[in-house]
Amino acid sequence: MKIITAYQEFKEFRNSIKSISFVPTMGNLHKGHMALIDKAKSYDSHVSASIFINPLQFNDASDFNNYPKSLDDDIALLSKHGCDSVFIPDSSILENIKEIKAPDTATYLCGMNRPGHFDGVLTIVNKLFEITKPTRSFFGKKAVSYTHLRAHETPEHGGMR
């Protein structure tokens, strides 16, 4: 499995791949994530995951600081399940990032209790999509609200991919 940490390197690597199934994660992987990897493998020849704990989606610094980190185990698990590459960017991915505002429907989801959460999710997913240019992307059931919001993203931000 290829491990890539620099986003420019991933962009260059992406040019050599015809199609890619992409599974964005924040790490601390479990069987639900592996089910997504397995599903992604059934579609394309190349499966890539990302691991990035996104500070933009935490409105409480202690939640971000206490988020579980299991990078070595995550890499081993992805490799065991046949993931072809993993993109593990550092915080420089956030430099000059285009901020995406969640639509008003976010307040009807859990956004009411987590101000800014969906803005942060949409912002990083948009950035990851700009870099990885996935043919397909896979999100778990927990992320249904993310895909709903992504589908309603405004055209000037790239819309749904």
Predicted regions and their residues:
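Conserved small/polar residues in nucleotide/adenosyl-binding loops
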Residues: 147-156
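Residue-level detector of structured alpha->beta connecting loops
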Residues: 18, 44-45, 82, 133
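Divalent-metal (Mg2+/Mn2+/Ca2+)-assisted nucleotide/phosphate chemistry catalytic cores
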Residues: 65-69, 74-138
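Di-metal (Zn2+ and/or Mg2+/Mn2+) metal-binding site signature of metallo-dependent hydrolases
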Residues: 25-40
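ATP-dependent adenylation/pyrophosphate-handling site
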Residues: 41-62
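Hydrophobic alpha-helical segments, chiefly the membrane-spanning helices
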Residues: 159-161
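Active-site glycine- and acidic-residue-rich loops that bind
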Residues: 28-29, 140-146
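Positively charged, low-complexity intrinsically disordered leader regions
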Residues: 1-18
